[in-house]
Amino acid sequence: MFTVVETSIFQKQWPMYWTEDERGAFAAELAVFPGSGVVVKESGGIRKVRWKRKGTGKSGGVRVIYFVWNEAEEVVRLLIYAKSEIDNIKGPALKEIRRALED
């Protein structure tokens, strides 16, 4: 099982979309299935997963951007957003976010 950690950006964003229980349920899912999201093209391995939120299905829910750090057995949650707010974040931009976090 992987450890799930969050960036400071994610910590500020999640309360806009989830309850504490929803956040915990998602973390539990990622800990067991870290490869559940699709790899975003040209992102250097960053993944995106759709997740439902109360009152919506997956298509109306949120998108969570994360990467799996296999060596440390960690899943790092980077960003969360509603699809209605942001259509897509391109791979090269996500790659830059990851590089900044690794420095």
Model-derived regions, located:
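Short, solvent-exposed recognition patches
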Residues: D21-E29
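Enriched for short, Lys/Arg-rich terminal
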Residues: V68-D103
